[in-house]
Amino acid sequence: MQSFEKEFLKPRSINIEKISEIHSKITLEPLERGFGHTLGNALRRILLSSMPGCAITEVEIEGVLHEYGTKEGVREDVLEILLNLKTLAINMYVKDSIVLTLKKTGIGPVIASDIEYDSSIISIVNPNHIICCITDQDTSIIMRIKVQRGRGYVPAFSRFSSDDQHDLPIGRLLLDACYSPVERISYTVEAARVEKRTDLDKLIIDMETNGTIDPEEAIRRAATILSDQLSSFIDLKDVHQPEVKEEKPEFDPSLLNLVDDLELTVRSANCLKAESIHYIGDLVQKTEVELLKTPNLGKKSLTEIKDVLASRGLSLGMRLDNWPPKHLSEQ
């Protein structure tokens, strides 16, 4: 008998239209009715929120104390410089975090390729990207730029505790990090036909990236993430937690208490100790006849002992298996 999942159509045609290096259209058809929106929306959300990438998270500009200032001899203010830095497309191959240096002197644009870096560790996809423009021949600009790997969108101050925020050195400028390499994605669902069936879906995904990843590779990664998350449901079973049975104590805890806890008269207590009756468990195993044979213990003391035991729900002549417990016998 054919399993039910094989009754569903799978895309027979996957067409990739490469509009540019960073822009592609991917078409999948045919899909069962409704699956176009189901898959399209799931992939879109993953591509926008969960794709790993690299972003600039911290910047220090020599001579600048805060983001609302300006740099003499530079056309852009600090806020505009930071916005330009945020749009740098960077790939990091080895490390999860690295600090880069930028130094430039003299009139002219400061571009991404002016950043000093090891090409075996990172690459800058848009090296001609303008960061700022120097308008004075004697002006120098020196920056320290921290690049980190991550995913999604992370606000600047969420990366630090409240105590760490107060300890940040003056002049360190924090940036909100958008790690996702996907800049724009949309999908549409059109009608598809297979033989006589006309109620099928065609899914068209239109996507642009920042150039650090091919659109096709981004789709593959998103599909892998989705598949991995759904794999937990494939072998879904109703797992019952094993019933934990409370272990009943081998003996009534009160039997492990010393005879002194009964607060007997001094005469009765001394008679019991003389017979090596130290625990209540030792006492309740004795019969009335055995106790009356104890030197200096008369009927009055016996009655006292019986009354005290009865007030605790105990009596003489009780049978206790495995007495004394191991930890008492070792004492």
From Swiss-Prot:
A Pfam family assignment: RNA_pol_L
Alpha C-terminal domain (alpha-CTD): region residues: 251-331
Membrane spanning stretches: none
Family annotation (SUPFAM superfamilies): C-terminal domain of RNA polymerase alpha subunit, Insert subdomain of RNA polymerase alpha subunit, RBP11-like subunits of RNA polymerase
Region (Alpha N-terminal domain (alpha-NTD)): 1-237
Enzymatic reactions: RNA(n) + a ribonucleoside 5'-triphosphate = RNA(n+1) + diphosphate
Record carries keyword Nucleotidyltransferase: yes
EC number assigned by the record: 2.7.7.6
GO biological process: DNA-templated transcription
GO terms assigned for molecular function: DNA binding; DNA-directed RNA polymerase activity; protein dimerization activity
Keyword Ligase: no
Highest taxon, organism lineage: Bacteria
GO cellular component, as recorded: cytoplasm; DNA-directed RNA polymerase complex
Keywords assigned: DNA-directed RNA polymerase, Nucleotidyltransferase, Transcription, Transferase
Protein family according to the UniProt entry: Belongs to the RNA polymerase alpha chain family.
UniProt free text on domains: The N-terminal domain is essential for RNAP assembly and basal transcription, whereas the C-terminal domain is involved in interaction with transcriptional regulators and with upstream promoter elements.
Subunit structure: Homodimer. The RNAP catalytic core consists of 2 alpha, 1 beta, 1 beta' and 1 omega subunit. When a sigma factor is associated with the core the holoenzyme is formed, which can initiate transcription.
Function: DNA-dependent RNA polymerase catalyzes the transcription of DNA into RNA using the four ribonucleoside triphosphates as substrates.
Protein name: DNA-directed RNA polymerase subunit alpha
Species, as recorded: Blochmanniella floridana
Gene: rpoA
